[in-house]
Amino acid sequence: MSGCDKFIGMLFLARDVTHSVHLNTRSYAKHQALGGFYDGIIDLADKFAEMYQGKYGLIGPIALMSAKKTSNVVEFLEDQAAEIESIRYDVVDRECTPLQNVIDEIVGLYYTTLYKLKFLA
């Protein structure tokens, strides 16, 4: 499989962006939602990377990315969730259900956080 390093880098970028917004918001609900996201995304990225390496071997250096646009965190998370859904079968074989399940958990965290940001913050 290819692209795992970029996939993990994408999750690291999400952590960086949401942590930055988390520290700069005046909304308690937004602060809490983003805090839950950046804590959760690192745990899931680590879980995914370890499982991936157990199946396919070492990933190698992680591709660290910089955000193109982060002024709207909801839009940023929506775009990333859509990208994850579009590349998931390029990163991991469709038949590798344990890793696909972790990707489901990752996407679920995005959607739960988007719900909190859109309707509770």
Where are these regions (language model features)?
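Short intrinsically disordered terminal tails
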Residues: 1, 120-121
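Amphipathic, soluble alpha-helical interaction motifs
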Residues: 17-24, 47, 51, 83-90, ...
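Context-gated lysine
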Residues: 6, 30, 47, 55, ...
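Generic structural signal for well-ordered, non-transmembrane alpha-helical segments
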Residues: 5, 9-12, 16, 35, ...
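Short, solvent-exposed segments of well-ordered alpha helices
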Residues: 2-9, 28-35, 67-71, 97, ...
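Acidic/histidine-rich alpha-helical segments that form the ligand environment
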Residues: 64-118
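Conserved alpha-helical segments that form or flank metal/cofactor-binding pockets of metalloenzymes
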Residues: 31-60
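Helix-loop segments that flank and shape redox-cofactor active sites
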Residues: 13-36, 91, 95
